[in-house]
Amino acid sequence: MENENKPNVANFEAAVAAKDYEKACSELLLILSQLDSNFGGIHEIEFEYPAQLQDLEQEKIVYFCTRMATAITTLFSDPVLEISDLGVQRFLVYQRWLALIFASSPFVNADHILQTYNREPNRKNSLEIHLDSSKSSLIKFCILYLPESNVNLNLDVMWNISPELCASLCFALQSPRFVGTSTAFNKRATILQWFPRHLDQLKNLNNIPSAISHDVYMHCSYDTSVNKHDVKRALNHVIRRHIESEYGWKDRDVAHIGYRNNKPVMVVLLEHFHSAHSIYRTHSTSMIAAREHFYLIGLGSPSVDQAGQEVFDEFHLVAGDNMKQKLEFIRSVCESNGAAIFYMPSIGMDMTTIFASNTRLAPIQAIALGHPATTHSDFIEYVIVEDDYVGSEECFSETLLRLPKDALPYVPSALAPEKVDYLLRENPEVVNIGIASTTMKLNPYFLEALKAIRDRAKVKVHFHFALGQSNGITHPYVERFIKSYLGDSATAHPHSPYHQYLRILHNCDMMVNPFPFGNTNGIIDMVTLGLVGVCKTGAEVHEHIDEGLFKRLGLPEWLIANTVDEYVERAVRLAENHQERLELRRYIIENNGLNTLFTGDPRPMGQVFLEKLNAFLKEN
């Protein structure tokens, strides 16, 4: 009995073979849900595999994906299969895992299934699929139209047939944590241009997969277009209409300002905030310092550990079984304490912060750049940011509160090594180039640049990708993508524990940073290991932060590229000139530049907030 509800590949295959399609869909959703919980890991899904694969983890994953893709093909190719309106929403929430099953198998995509839905035998182009007029066919098409699909899709036609189904597909196609290949990347780029004005027409979130709203909100930052964040504005409008019509939401009357211990109150809504997380390391010191002027109340999830809770005068778990209840709880805390400031150190990684950003909870509402991008919210007035991280203020809908560059001093990672034995190779036969990157930061433009570095360098180079989030069924797909550009000149290391990740980078001679979405922690890790590298700067904070950090660390400005051509040229120079590279590394090691990131005056944020509050009180 214990194993009956455990995800099991054989149970899924048996239900498909028996044409028990309701059970087959339930079994499939159970497997997809487990993949989602495990970030793509297959270790809690039961399936038998040949003993020969016992110690071959990647081959075992490809075997799993191939078996799953084969059974899904049989299931979805049968015209008898019907998926309900509710069913399609459940499948689209998990579409990214369906996509990875096919992408990490020899199938690559599910176009061979979509071809079975074609009803026009005399079509001129095999990539044109002519569906019958039933909603059932459109539903199945949407579930299996994946990021790697080569089939043509006219979004305008689909919108005219079913706006909510079209919007749901657009949500699903923006949800993967890896959209790196040119096919997938261009698909998302097209959606980011087309979708905002259409999304804004929806009355509410009722018939779209709102559980992945935060992926739509956050993943747009990894695109390259100037207006890539416009989708947030449309999503914010729909969320606002939804909470007003479905929740009966009323904003807090912010005329009353309360005081605790003779201080105005700042309510802080947290996402990921524990001592091991980067948001804690980058934003805790400034909040502790703000307690000089404000009484700080922290609101967060059970993942906020003791160190995270101790940042605040008091801390509460956000109560509520659903979003309506959570928002009402946050409002009640703000109301009962007469909050003067509502502050979120980060926004975009959790649904609660995004929904809260579309409400009025305090007279002054601000975010910091834990996820470095604008909110495009009508309810957020200010963004806290260090002055040297700003590329262009035009990237923001908010007013920037630009603090001195040492006003948000970092807390060193608890996992950072106490001692590093630096590996300084005088004249390596192969220059090992490290890349610290999550899967989300990989894209075709970055890989083309790496390919150009390899081709132009007069020395042999080898790229080591120390990848975050490349787990389970994600990794074979990511590895194939990297190899498609760099072949044997690259090693794609799957997601690994921090010390193992550092060991990969430790064995490198230099690093290069991803673009357009750069690194913060990756640069700290680089300098910790006595390495130097190249970055590309730009207008967005998530591009410009690399430049700011390089300058703070005392690295020469030639390592900061303004264009892709400069990036390639500087990386080639660093790879070819061993003596110059070693001198830079020794300079970094001897000057301990990291101390500049861990020291500073964290008081300006509290002072600036107090100035804004006093100005508000004077006017009101």
From Swiss-Prot:
Single GO cellular component term: cytoplasm
Q: Which reaction does it catalyse?
A: L-asparaginyl-[protein] + UDP-alpha-D-glucose = N(4)-(beta-D-glucosyl)-L-asparaginyl-[protein] + UDP + H(+)
UniProt keyword terms in alphabetical order: Cytoplasm, Glycosyltransferase, Transferase
Which Gene3D superfamilies does the UniProt record give? 3.40.50.11380, Glycogen Phosphorylase B (3.40.50.2000)
Q: What class of enzyme is it?
A: transferase
- The Enzyme Commission number assigned here is 2.4.1.-
Q: Which Pfam families match?
A: HMw1_D2 (PF18254), HMW1C_N (PF18071)
| InterPro entries in UniProt | Glycosyltr_41/O-GlcNAc_trsf, HMW1_D2, HMW1C_N
Specify the pathway: Protein modification; protein glycosylation
In its UniProt record, a GO molecular function of this protein is: glycosyltransferase activity
Location relative to the cell: Cytoplasm
Return one Gene Ontology term, BP aspect.
protein glycosylation
The record's comment on protein family reads: Belongs to the glycosyltransferase 41 family.
What function does the entry list? Answer: Inverting glycosyltransferase that catalyzes the transfer of one glucose moiety from UDP-glucose to an asparagine residue in peptides and proteins containing the NX(S/T) motif, resulting in their modification with a beta-linked 1,N-glucose. Likely acts as a key component of a general protein glycosylation system.
- Recorded protein name is UDP-glucose:protein N-beta-glucosyltransferase
Species: Actinobacillus pleuropneumoniae serotype 5b (strain L20)
